[in-house]
Amino acid sequence: MAKEQGTKPIAQNKKARHDYAIEDKYEAGLVLTGTEVKSLREGRASLAESFITIDRRGEMWLEGANIPEYLNGTWNNHAPKRKRKLLLHAAQIDKLARQTQAKGFTIIPLSLYFKDGRVKVEIALARGKKEFDKRQSLREEQDKREALRAMRYANKQVR
């Protein structure tokens, strides 16, 4: 079988971009079992309530991510919401650990995808938005949409 090329998205954390202001992004590998990979190949995953922690030994963990059991799995199927280890360089983990000590910063998963046949997680160093920030960003997006709509309408009238 030929080796897979390119990226294939599995799951997005859409709420994260709404609730957090993203400062910096990283790509991390993920330690998985065989049935987890098979379940991900079927496109079954959710990052909705997931978060990332750094333990005392300097290891990063993805917690709360839901990868449902593989339907054709046997007795050795995985637990759907277990902790999963993230693979990053030690220097990157140290940098993220220092930055999360700063006020208001946290590490969140943004997306889960296959890259050249391996499962990767896009994680971000983020700061939580206040309620008025969320409303303002929604208003800005709506204004952009209305401006594009008006420009399309004006261009259509010219023809």
UniProtKB/Swiss-Prot annotation:
Protein's organism: Bifidobacterium adolescentis (strain ATCC 15703 / DSM 20083 / NCTC 11814 / E194a)
Task: Give the family per the record.
Answer: Belongs to the SmpB family.
What GO terms describe the biological role, i.e. biological process, of this protein? trans-translation
Q: Which UniProt keywords apply?
A: Cytoplasm, RNA-binding
Matching entries from HAMAP family are given as: SmpB
Q: Localized where?
A: Cytoplasm
What is this protein for, i.e. what is its function? Required for rescue of stalled ribosomes mediated by trans-translation. Binds to transfer-messenger RNA (tmRNA), required for stable association of tmRNA with ribosomes. tmRNA and SmpB together mimic tRNA shape, replacing the anticodon stem-loop with SmpB. tmRNA is encoded by the ssrA gene; the 2 termini fold to resemble tRNA(Ala) and it encodes a 'tag peptide', a short internal open reading frame. During trans-translation Ala-aminoacylated tmRNA acts like a tRNA, entering the A-site of stalled ribosomes, displacing the stalled mRNA.
> InterPro entries from the xrefs?
SmpB (IPR023620), SsrA-bd_prot (IPR000037), SsrA-bd_prot_CS (IPR020081)
What are the recorded GO MF terms, alphabetically? Answer: RNA binding
Q: Name one GO cellular component term.
A: cytosol
* CDD domains to which the protein is assigned, alphabetical: SmpB
Official protein name in the record: SsrA-binding protein
